[in-house]
Amino acid sequence: MAPGGLRHNPGIAPRRRLAALVWSPDLLSIIQAAGWPIWPLIACSVLGLALVIERFISLKTAKIVPAKLLDEAIMVSRNGVPGPDVVKQLEQNSVLGEVLASGFRTLSGNPRASDEDLRANLEGAGRQAAAKLQRYLGALATIASAAPLLGLLGTVIGMIEIFGSQGADGGMGVTPGGGNPAQLAHGISIALYNTAFGLIVAIPALIFWRYFRARVDDYLLSMELAAERFARHLATLRR
């Protein structure tokens, strides 16, 4: 090896990271070798996993649009608007229950409410429900978009450090005083870990974001149809 090669300058930070990966090729060594840019990606991965778990728990069908809830609400109100206790229980049942309870409250507060008033209140409750269902999806989409860019940033920074350390030794190549091409290639491969990790974070985040968006859209469509049917039922109670 040339006297000016990488191994003869262990004090330079990029080379210490290279040595760590050579001697202990486990996940921790990869993280250490990749440098500080990988830590924002690790934070994104932890946050993304937490958001996915939270959305899976919150978007269960039983918590959003229970199968028989609309039929039960219509049944208990065949002879008139039910009492406050029943309305409160309906509201606490699910997100759809909150929308249906708003219709009962509108008719209870104003027995002569017009069709427009009933629909306006149901639509307002529906918009609040939509905001609740879409919560955190924007953050998940941001992680899916930002993770590849963070990975690319880490790779660029790592390559700058590698080429900078090569240049400090008097150039690259196999000429006397030049850098070691094998070590250069190894350093570039380590820098690319950031890009790979960024894609590992971004691809699942994008998949789950698309999945949750489709699930929310299905829920909103079911709630819209249920609200239309419920509005017609409330109109019969008003007469």
Q: Which residues does each PLM region occupy?
A:
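Residue-level signature of catalytic and energy-coupling elements of molecular machines
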Residues: 35, 49, 84-85, 100, ...
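Hydrophobic membrane-targeting segments
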Residues: 21-70
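Pore-lining and gate-forming transmembrane alpha-helices of multi-pass membrane transport proteins
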Residues: 182-209, 213
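Predominantly long cytosolic amphipathic alpha-helical stalk/bundle segments
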Residues: 64-153, 157-176, 208-239
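Short, strongly hydrophobic alpha-helical membrane anchors
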Residues: 7-33, 170-180
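Alpha-helical transmembrane segments of integral membrane proteins
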Residues: 38-51, 141-154, 201-205
